């Protein structure tokens, strides 16, 4: 026969008629240091006396619930996930299940569910070719963005070319882009025609109209009389010689410059 240690958790639990040690840890040991006098008047141990000595496993046969918690020397367990004070957990512990294993299995089950949920939505680059893509869910703007080098095309996303809806969308987008380009840039085959709907890019130079001998003679006589003419005299010459006012003005300017060059040449020749 082995001695029953009063500090053994299994012995205390058997005296108090507890099926699991959770009520002894949490329900009866209060933070203010109250005793177990309400449930068992024979026990006069305080919280300090109980917590000062380490709990060791007894060689006696103890219930599986007390054997699972016989190695702990703490009065309070900080891990609230593995051990719960719920009544439902204590009922399962009485049936022979360990609550810490149950909660760890539950947490691992939640992790597996999260992994499955994340795998159900793969990235664009990891979409296998066997995935059936419903073409009715995708509109033509998605196809256009993929044609213009969108992120789906950069990440290696390949459209199913066998689907007729996608092929029709590609053809329509290509034809639309070609029609827009043709409307923006009009075609002009001949630039020298000078047509109103296709103006020439380079402005053609006006053909020079030479002066007649009669016009030159009249202008020379007027220049010998007066090198500088006013507006009224210029108007009379233009009307008489059938010339524009601008032509008369330019001819007088050129004639003055010609006379100046002749004078400078005579001066240079006289020096030598």
From Swiss-Prot:
DNA-binding region: 204-263
Highest taxon above the source species: Eukaryota
Gene3D superfamilies, sorted: Homeodomain-like
Principal subcellular localisation of the protein: nucleus
InterPro entries: HD, HD_metazoa, Homeobox_CS, Homeodomain-like_sf
GO MF, any single term: DNA-binding transcription factor activity, RNA polymerase II-specific
Location of this chain's protein in the cell: Nucleus
Any single GO CC term annotated in Swiss-Prot or TrEMBL for this entry: nucleus
A Pfam family that the UniProt record links to this protein: Homeodomain
Sorted UniProt keywords: Developmental protein, DNA-binding, Homeobox, Nucleus, Transcription, Transcription regulation
Family from the record: Belongs to the Abd-B homeobox family.
Function: Sequence-specific transcription factor which is part of a developmental regulatory system that provides cells with specific positional identities on the anterior-posterior axis.
Protein name as catalogued: Homeobox protein Hox-D12
């Amino acid at each position: 026969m082995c001695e029953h240690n009063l500090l053994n958790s299994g012995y205390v639990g058997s005296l108090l008629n507890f099926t699991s040690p959770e009520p002894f840890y949490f329900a009866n040991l209060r933070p203010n240091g109250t005793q177990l006098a309400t449930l068992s008047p024979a026990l006069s141990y305080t919280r300090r006396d109980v917590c000062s000595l380490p709990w060791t496993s007894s060689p006696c046969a103890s219930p599986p619930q007390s054997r699972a918690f016989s190695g702990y020397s703490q009065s309070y367990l900080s891990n609230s996930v593995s051990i719960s004070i719920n009544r439902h957990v204590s009922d399962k512990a009485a049936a022979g299940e360990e609550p810490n294993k149950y909660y760890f299995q539950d947490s691992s089950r939640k992790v597996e569910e999260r992994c499955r949920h994340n795998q159900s939505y793969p990235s664009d680059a990891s979409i296998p070719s066997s995935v059936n893509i419903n073409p009715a869910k995708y509109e033509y703007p998605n196809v256009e963005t993929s044609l213009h080098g969108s992120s789906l095309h950069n990440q290696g996303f390949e459209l199913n070319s066998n689907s007729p809806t996608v092929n029709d969308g590609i053809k329509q987008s290509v034809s639309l882009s070609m029609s827009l380009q043709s409307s923006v840039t009009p075609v002009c085959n001949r630039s020298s025609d000078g047509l109103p709907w296709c103006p020439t890019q380079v402005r053609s130079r006006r053909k020079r109209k030479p002066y007649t001998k009669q016009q030159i003679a009249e202008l020379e006589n007027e220049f010998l009389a007066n090198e500088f003419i006013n507006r009224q005299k210029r108007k009379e010459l233009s009307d008489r010689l059938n010339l524009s006012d601008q032509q008369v003005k330019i001819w007088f300017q050129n004639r003055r410059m010609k006379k100046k060059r002749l004078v400078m040449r005579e001066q240079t020749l006289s020096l030598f």
